Amino acid sequence: MANLRKLGRRTDHRTAMLRNLVQSLFENGKIETTVTRAKEARREAEKMITLGKKGDLSARREALKYIYKKDVVYTLFEEIAPVYADRQGGYTRILKLGPRRGDGTEMCILELVDYTKKESSEEKETVKADK
């Protein structure tokens, strides 16, 4: 792979970190991270959404190779990818927040464009029970 950022980690640690970032992005709709990590995670997230748009069995198996949780792959294929059916790339956006207080690293929010996370019935019940 050309132009790969090493992010100060060994290959296995770097790939695991990026997989976790992408998985968290699909679970929550947005994540807060450093700008360089967000740029690398964005590359992988865009590839996964493109696989989700294909929607066939081989694409689902490719996504399962990269994403750890099966329910996140289901969410990707059934909820996230259909939102971007008519969009040709540019599924994510990076919003810069400014420097982190501890070390001054530039922070940002990586989020999915035009996607609002659906609340599951279990989450709604817990919110009602708390009130």
From Swiss-Prot:
Source species: Finegoldia magna (strain ATCC 29328 / DSM 20472 / WAL 2508) (Peptostreptococcus magnus)
The record lists the lineage as:
Bacteria, Bacillati, Bacillota, Tissierellia, Tissierellales
UniProt keyword Transport, yes or no: no
Would you kindly state one Gene Ontology biological process term found in this protein's UniProt entry?
Answer: translation
> Which HAMAP family does the record cross-reference, listed alphabetically?
Ribosomal_bL17
Q: How does it assemble?
A: Part of the 50S ribosomal subunit. Contacts protein L32.
UniProt keyword Ubl conjugation present: no
Cited Pfam families: Ribosomal_L17
Q: GO terms for molecular function, please?
A: structural constituent of ribosome
Family per record: Belongs to the bacterial ribosomal protein bL17 family.
Q: What keywords appear on the UniProt entry? A: Ribonucleoprotein, Ribosomal protein
Q: What is this protein called?
A: Large ribosomal subunit protein bL17
GO CC annotations, alphabetized: cytosolic large ribosomal subunit
